[in-house]
């Protein structure tokens, strides 16, 4: 096992512990608490994968951080903070929408890279909006917290979430997963739109009809799907 992988996990465990103390003292806001809960599940998954005890890793992580802080001068810390861009937390969904439980009549689940895609295949001919909570850096999506698909009535019919045992994903991973979710929902004649906020930070542009810009590969796939549907309709007639 790579030593850097172990030390990274140990430091992450200790930093999570510090953030938990912040929440216990009622100093954290809603996004802070949301990230804390999700990181806790991620750490459990990583600990299981690495075969490491979280409590023991936290103690070692504390020693690593204390050693770094002891050697770090105040001036170096100021320079580091000044040169490091701060990420922002973007919220399309309310806390209620983010935490609400939902159920599927015809569940379908697919893993796309480090992301898990879930959708209800029973949903047909609905207008659906994709909304997400995520962090942004340099005006680009950095980390997806959670994406959900909502009908006009407010029902949740789809979701994209990071895999707890597979930490880390890129903006391309997110866009690919969104493409898969849209394709799955549109197969049942649903009309899918993406929130302007998500369009802006994931694609850097906003489409008037609410759809994300499609790659040539996605356009070819949609064309093949449309041709197949036409053939099926003709056979049915």
Swiss-Prot record:
From the record, which residues define motif Nuclear export signal? Answer: 137-146
Query: What ranges does the record give for the region CPSF4-binding, renumbered to this chain?
Result: 180-215
Keyword presence, Membrane: no
List, alphabetically, the SUPFAM superfamilies matched. Ns1 effector domain-like, S15/NS1 RNA-binding domain
Entry superkingdom: Viruses
PABPN1-binding: annotated span:
223-230
| Motif Nuclear localization signal per UniProt: ranges | 34-38
Cellular compartments per GO CC: host cell cytoplasm; host cell nucleus
Q: Where is this region: Disordered?
A: 205-237
Which Gene Ontology molecular function entries are recorded, alphabetically?
protein serine/threonine kinase inhibitor activity; RNA binding
Which InterPro entries does the entry link to?
A: NS1, NS1A, NS1A_effect_dom-like_sf, uS15_NS1_RNA-bd_sf
Question: Compositionally biased, Basic residues: which spans?
Answer: 217-237
**What are its GO biological-process terms?**
symbiont-mediated suppression of host cytoplasmic pattern recognition receptor signaling pathway via inhibition of RIG-I activity; symbiont-mediated suppression of host gene expression; symbiont-mediated suppression of host mRNA processing; symbiont-mediated suppression of host PKR/eIFalpha signaling; symbiont-mediated suppression of host type I interferon-mediated signaling pathway
Q: Describe the processing and modification events after translation.
A: Upon interferon induction, ISGylated via host HERC5; this results in the impairment of NS1 interaction with RNA targets due to its inability to form homodimers and to interact with host EIF2AK2/PKR.
Compartments, as annotated in UniProt: Host nucleus; Host cytoplasm
Q: Where is this region: RNA-binding and homodimerization?
A: 1-73
Q: Per the record's keyword annotation, is RNA-binding included, yes or no?
A: yes
Summarize subunit and interaction data from the UniProt record for this chain: Homodimer. Interacts with host TRIM25 (via coiled coil); this interaction specifically inhibits TRIM25 multimerization and TRIM25-mediated RIGI CARD ubiquitination. Interacts with human EIF2AK2/PKR, CPSF4, IVNS1ABP and PABPN1.
Comment, domains: The dsRNA-binding region is required for suppression of RNA silencing.
Q: What is the documented function of this protein?
A: Inhibits post-transcriptional processing of cellular pre-mRNA, by binding and inhibiting two cellular proteins that are required for the 3'-end processing of cellular pre-mRNAs: the 30 kDa cleavage and polyadenylation specificity factor/CPSF4 and the poly(A)-binding protein 2/PABPN1. In turn, unprocessed 3' end pre-mRNAs accumulate in the host nucleus and are no longer exported to the cytoplasm. Cellular protein synthesis is thereby shut off very early after virus infection.
Q: Which family does it belong to?
A: Belongs to the influenza A viruses NS1 family.
This protein's name: Non-structural protein 1
What organism is the protein native to? Influenza A virus (strain A/Alaska/6/1977 H3N2)
